[in-house]
Amino acid sequence: MARYLGPKLKLTRREGTDLFLKSGVRAIDSKCKLEAAPGQHGARKARLSEYGVQLREKQKVRRTYGVLEKQFRNYYKDAARLKGNTGENLLTLLETRLDNVVYRMGFGATRAEARQLVSHKSIMVNGRVVNIPSFKVSANDVISVREKSQKQARIKAALEVASQREKPTWVEVDAAKMEGAFKRLPERSDLSADINEQLIVELYSK
């Protein structure tokens, strides 16, 4: 599947918020002027229409999770079929992607790095190698780093970075064993308050 390979901070500046596309070793605002649009001079951002606000929110979430437009729309359709709040269902589906869970557990410093680990067959689910980043993780699944991959410096570095940030309550990780359990589906209160998923629902409902 195609992926955006351009400058990560350009996307961050376009959305005006930290998309967690970089490792988090340094504060994002020390590297990137979030209030300025991309470009050498960072032209002042125009006031957005209602549609523009909805579109920006969708782009922000889509880019945060590293999902392309067609796949993101499919996630929305799946979320709409489920019982409950469509917006919250959408976030839950995105959170159950294997690449995201690998990132949440700290095996990858970014979701892009976690996706690469999965694609390169460095990750196991319940003892079996899975190389599909979009693989849906279920409650109580055990995620581990393949033994032959455990010496990778980037995984050790990622775990060190993860130890410095707040740990998600819905995963349990044994950093020494490079193994973790996806204990439960995250609740809306567990996730970023900076996301307004209702704007995405309104966008796709038109």
From Swiss-Prot:
Entry superkingdom: Bacteria
Keyword RNA-binding listed: yes
Described purpose of this protein according to its UniProt entry: One of the primary rRNA binding proteins, it binds directly to 16S rRNA where it nucleates assembly of the body of the 30S subunit. With S5 and S12 plays an important role in translational accuracy.
Gene name of the encoded protein: rpsD
Start and end residues of each S4 RNA-binding domain: 96-156
UniProt keyword Ribonucleoprotein, yes or no: yes
GO cellular component: small ribosomal subunit
InterPro entries reported for this sequence: Ribosomal_uS4 (IPR022801), Ribosomal_uS4_bac-type (IPR005709), Ribosomal_uS4_CS (IPR018079), Ribosomal_uS4_N (IPR001912), S4_RNA-bd (IPR002942), S4_RNA-bd_sf (IPR036986)
GO biological process assignments: ribosomal small subunit biogenesis; translation
Name of the molecule in the record: Small ribosomal subunit protein uS4
Stated family: Belongs to the universal ribosomal protein uS4 family.
Molecular-function GO term, any one: rRNA binding
Keywords: Ribonucleoprotein, Ribosomal protein, RNA-binding, rRNA-binding
Transmembrane intervals: none
Subunit (UniProt): Part of the 30S ribosomal subunit. Contacts protein S5. The interaction surface between S4 and S5 is involved in control of translational fidelity.
Pfam name, any one: S4
